[in-house]
């Protein structure tokens, strides 16, 4: 008898067998109730008796087919952390849990399919080795970016590094609070300036967070709010003599809608701005265009520190006389790309007197923040992880999607020892393989191509019982596209000959990164106990 006493039902119709059309119908009903892909409540496929199908049970193998890291931590903890106490987990004794990439150093002892290449000699490391003090400040939506990603994948603060995490609002849609926690972030940045930190790295999350919503008015209000707080920070920084770099990690907010009037809710390939302010030499600077990797060498130059050989980025102000060792503020306006100067750009539409004044009075450059410039595939929109990692590393760091794509193209994905072992163990044990993956073809968090590849591997190995647990994106996909994508996937499963889609839920539920474990519990309970909205053939 297996866990929970649930017996898999024998079904004959392909639509029931594969599950995609059934879940798609349930999602359409939830759309009518106002739910969206991003925040979709957990859905569970059930048999004719209302019993959940394909739950994760002891002895099974699980592959978490998402990449990147910070959003996958909470759900992974619930499955593998023996000290987990945020809610009562099942208490697996014999579950093989494979992660696609290393989400956090705490998971280093788990089977990792594509282990990371550590980035050494980052901006933060050089500053720390010089005995200087540094401060990282962000609200929780972007905290991992100014710490883990900016530090090249290092979770631990360096000597002399202080990290400040401000909680983002919870329990309310972000477009209803476009200010987020910006006042508190601003206050901590200004406090750091007054405290005299040698390097301050801060993130204003609003542009990216609001850029992912469909609320045009909130996007415009967001731009105005960021502008006002930008003024406070710049005034404090220049007053204290800080060399100040204002830039972005990627584009998003600058595009409000597509040409056909549909709301634009995803990252862009646009360049991002760089304003470089030196209060000792205002406006006396030749600034060149470049890439995000040029940020770290430029900051080190102002700090009076030598740039390591590993940093291949160039100086953005190569001939500027800094006049000795300076203090530096790097302020990242998340998602604040360079867009058209018309009504499709919330930044243009909003009252932004501070931004307008800075771009008129100070040197201004364009930095490439997408595609190959940040280690992504050519033509791929930028993202916060790649942006911050490349800024901190001072060199192009190949991102997980490129490494995984290379593995898919050269065939090494299909021979990955960790993945092959998971399939073989499920087969030898006569248990099930579970694939938790993102229902997207272009998200920076993952691709449906990975579960499909694993299904082909399982089919070739003779493993028949494979279940898919899908996370709807709502960011890289068009709003309302979930049912169509599920039906397309169902057809692909039919061609492969194995696989059943047994659960689905929104990215905002399954991949929370704000410490809201009530969301994580909803995802976990659906995956393990079958708790969620039941979906059955009609």
List PLM regions with ranges.
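Feature captures the catalytic ectodomains and active-site-proximal regions of enzymes
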Residues: 1-538
């Amino acid at each position: 008898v297996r866990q929970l006493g649930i017996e898999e039902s024998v079904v004959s119709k392909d639509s029931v067998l594969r599950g995609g059309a059934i879940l798609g119908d349930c999602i359409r009903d939830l759309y009518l109730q106002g739910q969206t892909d991003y925040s979709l409540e957990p859905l569970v496929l059930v048999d004719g008796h209302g019993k959940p199908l394909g739950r994760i049970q002891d002895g099974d193998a699980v592959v978490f087919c998402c990449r990147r890291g910070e959003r996958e931590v909470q759900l992974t903890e619930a499955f593998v952390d023996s000290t987990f106490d945020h809610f009562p987990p099942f208490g697996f004794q014999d579950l093989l849990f494979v992660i696609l990439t290393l989400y956090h150093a705490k998971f280093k002892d788990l089977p990792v399919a594509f282990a990371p290449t550590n980035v050494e000699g980052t901006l933060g490391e050089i500053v720390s080795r010089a005995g200087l003090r540094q401060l990282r400040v962000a609200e929780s939506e972007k905290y991992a970016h100014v710490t883990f990603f900016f530090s090249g994948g290092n979770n631990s603060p360096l000597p002399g590094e202080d990290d400040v995490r401000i909680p983002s609002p919870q329990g309310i849609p972000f477009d209803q609070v476009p200010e987020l926690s910006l006042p508190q972030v601003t206050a901590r940045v200004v406090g750091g300036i007054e405290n005299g930190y040698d390097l301050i790295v801060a993130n204003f999350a609003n542009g990216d967070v609001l850029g992912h919503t469909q609320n045009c008015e909130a996007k415009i209000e967001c731009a105005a709010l960021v502008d006002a707080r930008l003024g406070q920070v710049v005034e404090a920084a220049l007053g204290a003599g800080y060399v100040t770099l204002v830039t972005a990690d990627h584009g998003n907010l600058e595009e409000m809608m597509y040409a056909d009037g549909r709301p634009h809710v995803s990252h862009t390939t646009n360049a991002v701005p760089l304003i470089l302010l030196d209060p000792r030499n205002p406006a006396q600077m030749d600034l060149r265009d470049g890439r995000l990797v040029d940020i770290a060498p430029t900051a080190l130059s102002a700090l009076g520190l030598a740039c390591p050989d590993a940093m291949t980025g160039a100086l953005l102000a190569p001939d500027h006389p800094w006049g000795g060792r300076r203090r530096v503020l790097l302020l990242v306006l998340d998602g604040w790309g360079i867009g058209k100067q018309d009504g499709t750009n919330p930044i243009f539409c909003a009252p932004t007197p501070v931004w307008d004044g800075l771009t008129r009075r100070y040197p201004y450059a364009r930095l490439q923040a997408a595609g190959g410039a940040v280690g992504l595939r050519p033509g791929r929109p930028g993202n916060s992880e790649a942006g911050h990692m490349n800024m901190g590393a001072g060199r192009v760091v190949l991102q997980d999607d490129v490494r995984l794509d290379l593995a898919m193209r050269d065939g090494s994905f299909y021979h990955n020892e960790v993945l092959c072992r998971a399939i073989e163990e499920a087969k030898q044990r006569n248990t099930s393989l579970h694939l938790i993956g993102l229902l997207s073809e272009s998200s920076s968090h993952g691709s449906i191509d990975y579960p499909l590849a694993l299904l082909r591997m399982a089919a070739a190995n003779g493993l028949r019982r494979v279940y898919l647990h899908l996370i709807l994106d709502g960011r890289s996909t068009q709003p309302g596209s979930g049912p169509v994508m599920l039906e397309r996937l169902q057809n692909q499963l039919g061609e492969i000959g194995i696989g059943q889609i047994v659960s689905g839920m929104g990215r905002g539920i399954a991949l929370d990164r704000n410490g809201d474990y009530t969301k994580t519990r909803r995802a976990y309970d659906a995956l393990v106990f079958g708790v969620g909205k039941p979906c059955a053939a009609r």
